[in-house]
Amino acid sequence: MSNIYTSADQLIGKTPLLELTHIEKELQLKARILAKLESFNPAGSVKDRIAKKMIDDAEAAGQLKPGSVIIEPTSGNTGIGLASVAAARGYRIIIVMPETMSVERRQLMKAYGAELVLTEGAKGMKGAIAKADELAKEIPNSFVPGQFVNPSNPKAHIETTGPEIYEDTDGKVDYFVAGVGTGGTVTGVGQYLKRKVPSVKVVAVEPASSPVLSQGVAGAHKIQGIGAGFVPDVLDTKVYDEIIPVSNEDAFADGRLVGRKEGVLVGISSGAALHAAVELAKRPENEGKTIVVLFPDTGDRYLSTPLFAD
């Protein structure tokens, strides 16, 4: 039977779960760590899911029509995902991002035909959001998906990522671990899994040098994609049972470990999530348990960063 797709956005989702057997052995872990490899999405990250869902829902609501311009503030992967879906649907797209994001991310967005507007690095995501709102007022027929406030973001994970994890593990999942950027992933997957497996524990990962969720303090950090510096509207702060802060150095080290031990290149935030998952796996009470950790993207968009500097 033929199995042919007619648009790249039909390829989003159904990403594989990989047990990190070599890392389990190397670190003598007695729990299983299963990594959800979101780099298998067509534009290379978990953000493809929310890009498609936000555009689908905006089209259904009449907010996006032929000739509309999509404007989005993003630290990178959402911009790449939106640029890909916009290209597949024929929309013009403008991405607003802090100048501190990796050069690969900028090049990728441009490769999909997106226009880029860079904002002052020191102002972080707040500066990018303010600039996007300003552009939206100036440009007619524009639409700002607003990943930090758009309920379609967590909904994408309630409808796709959560069910995929549940089905692929036959419901045998004890922990779900994910970094918090917009909070959409941890919220959507967490809500879905807790409905299906009430005993599951959800663990949020944030940068140790910007512990907004655990201590209410924002700061500079190098873990691109998580730690926005504020508590996003779409984040359900009641869904997670624990917050694990991870240092830049540990995120880099564990990100490198995946490539060298498992043969899969992952990004910095995947390294942070793995560090938290390993911390859980080392606890004696978690022997024999299954920990699902979400790896948001691939490492090839971080070749210019300290992740692969040595």
Protein language model annotation of sequence segments:
Residues 1-310:
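PLP-dependent amino-acid enzyme catalytic core
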